[in-house]
Amino acid sequence: MAFAMRPEWKDEPVSTTGASYVEPSATDLIKPGRRVAHLFPRSVMEEYVLQRVTERVWWVSRHFYGSLFYVGTRGVLLLDPFLGGADATVKAVASVTDLPVTAVVYSHFHADHVGGARRLFELLASAPPRVIASENTAIWMERFGSDLPWPTDVLEWPSGSLSFEDVTLRLRGLPRPGHAPDHAVFLLEEERVGHSADLINIDQLPFGGFAGQDPLVLFKPNLEFARSLEFDWFCGGHGNIGEKSDFDFYLTYLDEVAGLVNEYVPRPEVVPDLSLTDYLGGLDEASRSRLLTGLDNHFGLYLYGRQIAAGHPPAGGGGNPFMSGTIGEWATERKEAVDAAVPRIIERLRPTYGRMYNFDDAQPGNVRLMAMAIQPSLTNR
């Protein structure tokens, strides 16, 4: 039965790629240029959303998280057992096959995407699946001392692979991981389907904070790398099921935002040398001696040095040691310029993007982040 929208609910956002919305189907393959309809209210109201992607691959979504599973001839390969979704995912798998889940892939070691493995293994206790992950993920889990099921099959970074029945699972580590040190794309090669959680939100504007991409200036190269890979369909761990057109949209949007940032808050032509210790050279001997009387380390000097040198007692708390003196003054000036520019940039974006998913809620912060990311600072200039 078709999902029924209610008059009092907010209208569905428009597609970022101009896609047509269709009811999800566990039997019919989704066609190019189509996306699953009413995904946000479905995520609130329904147990899970299931869409067939290829003859052997399904996309499953629950509570704003998404993953893929491949149905072989002897078992099922599941990519990302996201937190809170194990029972629903097992139910979704069982709705299309009687075969058991025999292998699980961790896309990266963030518990919201793989933390459901604990519950999944409880459900599959009679025949626990193997766990596949990159060596970067395996090392990180070991160092952290994770209590999640550990990888049994470790893929060499950045491009290891293994066979799961008739499909090749290929790791393609991102060239400049910013979201996590093990951030990667996984490909089901013969099916031409890709998966990378937290790289792109399909059919949505970028998530608030760009999902923690850091440094933000390296986000675009990672998107370009992922787009260059061989796939027809892609799961981003959040949002809809999508295609390369979703990557094209992201790249275009980032370029447009960057262009507006450079228009409204360009880098100043003259940037001072930003230093935490620029004042030391101008101190007399008594002031230097006062510093050595009150301090025995340069972290403390960053916190309190200017106050002590001026003859004042150190202020409680100390603030951010890397925002003292001229650096703090510079950062405050640039932040004020960015804060003034963001509302104007948002209104320039609104005619094209204003009806898209999370425009008013997430994009002001994203524009601010992008603007600050290109400003010279202590570490970048």
Predicted regions and their residues:
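C-terminal regulatory/interaction regions
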Residues: A2-A19, L274-R381
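Active-site HxH/HxHxD metal-binding segment of metal-dependent hydrolases
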Residues: R6, K91-S163, L260
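Conserved beta-strand hairpin/beta-sheet module of binuclear metal-dependent hydrolase folds
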Residues: E46-A92, V185-D198
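Active-site environment of divalent metal-dependent phosphoester hydrolases
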Residues: A86, F109-G116, A138-M141, H179-D182, ...
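Divalent-metal (often Zn2+) His-rich catalytic cores of metallo-beta-lactamase-fold enzymes
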Residues: V217-T293
